[in-house]
């Protein structure tokens, strides 16, 4: 009898280490292991982790004795070879541990460890059929609320419990704490139906007769009859009718509310799926205008010779209609399509518009969705189901899905900095990662925007990308007129109304009198960013961070926007005791508050992080603004993305100077993009809109380009500055950030690392220096910046940086300082 061979497997684990780990395969598992399946392995003294098999071989590890693999979780791979190749590129390019990439890629339910905690699923019912082990776990969770897998292993008396837990999660008996803590809110819509009392035909007929006899009740009668005609019946009960559908048909919302108050109608919240679009009625595609048709043909022509094409279309030019045509072509060929958007929470309208064309083929993927939905989409994409989830709409994390037949990637609003992951590692840019993903799959990539990033536009001009310009608004609509209001002059003339220039107030009143709506943009939330003592200039500061506290009136509290620390408002100066404290600056909350004093009969709402803590809150505000129930919408940059309103007569930008004066080489680029994007909300259907920008310096050159809608003029000036001062796209940048709770140790460590880097990179190293905010969450911070020539070998540069980092951490004094690496900071 021949001796059986011993095999080993390299396992990728979700730990922040730059290596895979080799484990021995038990003979009985030899036939079960293959690339891409998950296994349970021991790690450290007592942990059990879920890892991914990346290679099977016969090489015995020399540095340590290989431990045995405990269990195989999958019959088939959950990760593809192309996907793993993509992970390795992310790890290499962004200098991130491969385990961090795995962590970012996989839904939490795929990564159970012995320290994972579980609870009973909210939908679990005690009458479910359970086997003996499942019953013991359920009984234990009834007693303890939540338990980790190590504790449950002890209760069952078995070492490897993950397979049991996996099965119970799939059966919706239990839920991981990671899934529970996602604060997932099911999407719901408000519907109207008859109350039980008025389900009686005789009573209802009598009430309708009463309405018919009163001229003043005409709107109530129309509303009730529409509900009755639209409501489908199952037996004797009427199915609820969506409020949105009723309002779209011209039904008066106030009439519906009156009928509800009087007990004839009642509202119900009906939960609808976020995953598929069965809730939307399919529509015919819109006909393209000649300008759109020409742009579409140019895109197709560019795609013959380029993987990547940049579609530069002005705001309101109808880029979405082009996307629809290109998506349909790919789906018809049996391909998958990825539609990347900057923030899923801000794109309700886009999802609804695409759902109207593609129905159940759409899947929405985002890290805020619950684990069961994310796993469902993952498995469906992996299985390459020909009928479901062929079009994925998602934010950054959707680039990590296991695509099989990817034909097209669309990156909408490609300039947005929210495509860049900041913390934790990997700090990748989803736009750039999508381009690499396109190359791996031989899929076409379309970057769409009204305000291209400097890098993307340069690549297009250099011929690296295809370039298509769409310079006409849809159906010949005119671009808005843009004016600057000189607040320096108005303050001098004492014509300001608090933070509103007379020019802006006149514009607001003019728009409201014409029955139009207004959007006001201020890229700062809260009531006021700072309190200051008039005697000694003291300001209340965060105890954890080197930053002033922001006052929030609705909670009457001071809050740090960096660490979340909250404290009560102060009544006197913390330095000199004076009670002469004044508020300096203004945020969206203060604008809303003060504007309501000037315009008491106007409905004013905010759209910012504080007012949209839940998804439903965001959707309600957008829905109410769409249906003209809100007259003025005050918001941060949330109002610049993915929104399309047809009745906005005026857009006001309250503080352009704050946007332009940030200490960042991208400040002008970001300011131009934000102002052009928010200006694009004005004037959609049959009237030219108006934009008023408040500034102390109306002659500032960027404002001139914004007023003229002149992206090319802006680009030509900005690109010269970048070249002159060695910034991207002419140089690549890598930021190294060190953190330590001890400022003295941080200073020494930062200088040590800088000296090592200068041995290799000479004058290309800038720093070390404190950032604008030198302490966050009790950690002092120092930054080192490296500028590298564009044509330098990327691989060699990063190898040298890593070599210097390894030497740095070989010295004991440096080990207490935390290091993070940001390649291509954005």
Predicted features by range, described:
Residues 4-6, 18, 187, 618, ...:
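A general secondary-structure signal for short beta-strands and their flanking turns/coil
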Residues 88-91, 153, 505, 592, ...:
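Generic solvent-exposed, charged/amphipathic alpha-helical segments
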Residues 283-289, 293-296, 304-747, 755, ...:
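Inter-lobe coupling/hinge segments of SF2-like helicase ATPases
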Residues 96, 108-122, 134-139, 145-151, ...:
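C-terminal accessory/connector segments of nucleic-acid motor ATPases
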Residues 31, 400, 642, 775-776:
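Short glycine/serine/proline-enriched coil/turn segments at secondary-structure junctions
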Residues 1-449, 463-477, 760, 794-802, ...:
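Accessory, non-ATPase domains that flank or precede helicase/AAA+ motor cores in DNA-metabolism machines
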């Amino acid at each position: 009898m021949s001796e059986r061979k011993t095999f080993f497997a390299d396992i990728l684990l979700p730990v922040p280490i730059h290596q895979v780990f080799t484990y021995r395969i038990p003979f009985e598992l030899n036939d079960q292991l293959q690339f891409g399946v998950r296994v349970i392995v021991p790690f450290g003294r007592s942990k059990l982790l879920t890892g991914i098999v990346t290679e099977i071989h016969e090489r015995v590890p020399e540095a340590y004795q290989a431990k045995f693999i405990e269990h195989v979780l999958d019959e088939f791979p959950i990760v593809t070879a192309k996907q793993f190749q993509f992970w390795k590129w992310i790890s290499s390019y962004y200098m991130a541990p491969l385990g961090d990439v795995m962590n970012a890629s996989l839904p939490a339910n795929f990564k159970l460890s012995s320290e994972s905690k579980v609870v009973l699923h909210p939908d679990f019912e005690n009458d479910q059929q359970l086997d003996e082990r499942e019953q013991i776990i359920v009984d234990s969770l009834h007693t303890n609320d939540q338990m980790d897998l190590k504790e449950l292993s002890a209760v069952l008396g078995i070492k490897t419990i993950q397979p049991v837990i996996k099965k119970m999660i799939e059966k919706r008996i239990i839920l991981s704490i990671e899934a529970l803590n996602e604060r997932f809110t099911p999407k719901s819509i408000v519907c109207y139906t008859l109350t039980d009392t008025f389900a009686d035909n005789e009573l209802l007929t009598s009430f309708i007769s009463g309405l018919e006899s009163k001229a003043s009740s005409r709107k109530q009668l129309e509303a009730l009859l529409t509900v009755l005609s639209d409501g489908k019946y199952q037996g004797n009960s009427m199915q609820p009718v969506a409020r949105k559908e009723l309002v779209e048909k011209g039904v008066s919302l106030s009439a519906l509310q009156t009928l509800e108050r009087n007990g004839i109608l009642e509202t119900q919240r009906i939960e609808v799926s976020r995953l598929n679009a069965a809730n939307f009625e399919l529509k015919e595609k819109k006909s393209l205008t000649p300008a759109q048709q020409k742009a579409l043909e140019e895109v197709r022509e560019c795609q013959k010779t380029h993987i990547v094409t940049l579609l530069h279309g002005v705001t309101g030019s109808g880029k979405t209609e082009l996307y629809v045509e290109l998506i349909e072509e790919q789906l018809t060929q049996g391909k998958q399509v990825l539609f990347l958007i900057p923030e899923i929470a801000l794109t309700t309208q886009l999802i609804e518009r695409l759902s109207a064309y593609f129905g159940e083929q759409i899947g929405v993927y985002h890290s805020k969705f619950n684990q069961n939905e994310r796993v469902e989409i993952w498995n469906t994409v992996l299985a390459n189901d020909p009928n479901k989830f062929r079009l994925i709409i998602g934010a950054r994390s959707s680039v990590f899905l296991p695509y099989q037949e990817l034909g097209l990637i669309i990156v909408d609003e490609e300039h947005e900095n929210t495509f860049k992951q900041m913390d934790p590692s990997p700090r990748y840019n989803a736009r750039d990662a999508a381009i690499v993903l396109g190359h791996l799959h031989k899929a076409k990539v379309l970057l769409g925007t009204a305000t291209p990033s400097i890098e993307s536009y340069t690549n297009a001009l250099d011929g690296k990308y295809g370039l298509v310009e769409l310079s006409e608004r849809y159906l010949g609509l005119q671009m808005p007129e843009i004016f600057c209001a000189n607040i320096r002059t108005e303050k001098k003339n004492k014509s300001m109304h608090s933070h509103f220039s007379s020019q802006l107030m006149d514009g607001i009143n003019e728009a409201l009198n014409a029955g139009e709506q207004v959007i006001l943009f201020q890229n700062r939330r809260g009531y006021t960013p700072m309190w200051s003592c008039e005697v000694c200039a003291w300001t209340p500061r965060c105890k954890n961070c080197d930053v002033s506290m922001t006052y929030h009136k609705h909670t009457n509290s001071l809050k740090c926007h960096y660490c979340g620390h909250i404290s009560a408002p102060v009544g006197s100066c913390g330095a000199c005791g004076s009670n002469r404290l004044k508020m300096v600056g203004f945020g969206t909350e203060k604008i809303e508050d003060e504007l309501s004093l000037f315009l008491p009969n106007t409905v004013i709402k905010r759209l910012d992080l504080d007012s949209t803590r839940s998804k439903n809150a965001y959707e309600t505000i957008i829905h109410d603004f769409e249906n003209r129930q809100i007259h003025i919408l005050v918001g941060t940059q949330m109002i610049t993305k993915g929104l399309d309103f047809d009745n906005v007569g005026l857009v006001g930008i309250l503080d352009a100077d704050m946007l332009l004066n940030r200490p960042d080489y991208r400040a002008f680029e970001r300011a131009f993009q934000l102002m052009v994007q928010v200006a694009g909300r004005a004037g959609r259907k049959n009237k030219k809109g108006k934009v008023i920008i408040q500034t102390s310096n109306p002659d500032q050159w960027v404002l001139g380009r914004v007023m003229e809608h002149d992206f090319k003029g802006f680009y030509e000036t900005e690109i010269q500055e970048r070249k002159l001062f060695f910034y991207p796209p002419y140089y690549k940048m890598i930021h190294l950030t060190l953190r330590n709770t001890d400022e003295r140790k941080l200073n020494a460590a930062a200088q040590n690392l800088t000296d090592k880097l200068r041995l290799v990179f000479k004058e290309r190293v800038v720093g070390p220096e404190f950032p604008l905010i030198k302490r966050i969450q009790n950690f002092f911070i120092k930054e080192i910046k490296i500028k590298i020539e564009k044509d330098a070998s990327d691989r060699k540069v990063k190898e040298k940086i890593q070599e210097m980092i390894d030497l740095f951490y070989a010295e004991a004094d440096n080990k207490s300082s935390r290091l993070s690496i940001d390649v291509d900071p954005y």
